[in-house]
Amino acid sequence: MSNNYETLYILRPDLGEEVVQQQVERYRTLITEHSATDIQVKVWGKKRLAYPIKKLNDGVYVQMNYQASGKQVAPMERAMRLSDEVIRYLTLKLDRVVAPPADLSPLTEIPPSPITEAVVEDDGISAED
């Protein structure tokens, strides 16, 4: 039975654009060879990591959505685990198909609501009592 999966992996930030494209194509080919379908790849680009990984503060994020069986995902994860270029990866089984985001621009800022002063009435009790 075919399930929907999303794999997000982070490549080292010091890789050139050509090497990043080679790695993306490598994992796309690997998952295709294992009969995965509906493969969608989105390269997010270089982003700051939430915390250092292997003494690195940045990484190149790549999101891949596809349909496959669990047995087809394992060879790709093994290749990522053994790769020096991949610093972290995560594969999630999705309940439904989720399209990769079209634009990763910052969220629209919501203007702050006006601050209203609250009137506190004195109840006759002091903090010193």
UniProtKB/Swiss-Prot annotation:
One of its GO terms (biological process) is translation. One of its GO terms (cellular component) is ribonucleoprotein complex. CDD domains: bS6_chloro_cyano. It comes from the Bacteria. Keywords: Ribonucleoprotein, Ribosomal protein, RNA-binding, rRNA-binding. One of its GO terms (molecular function) is small ribosomal subunit rRNA binding. InterPro entries: Ribosomal_bS6, Ribosomal_bS6_CS, Ribosomal_bS6_sf, Ribosomal_S6_plastid/chlpt, Transl_elong_EF1B/ribsomal_bS6. Binds together with bS18 to 16S ribosomal RNA. PANTHER family: MITOCHONDRIAL 28S RIBOSOMAL PROTEIN S6 (PTHR21011), SMALL RIBOSOMAL SUBUNIT PROTEIN BS6M (PTHR21011:SF1). Belongs to the bacterial ribosomal protein bS6 family. This is Small ribosomal subunit protein bS6. It comes from Microcystis aeruginosa (strain NIES-843 / IAM M-2473).
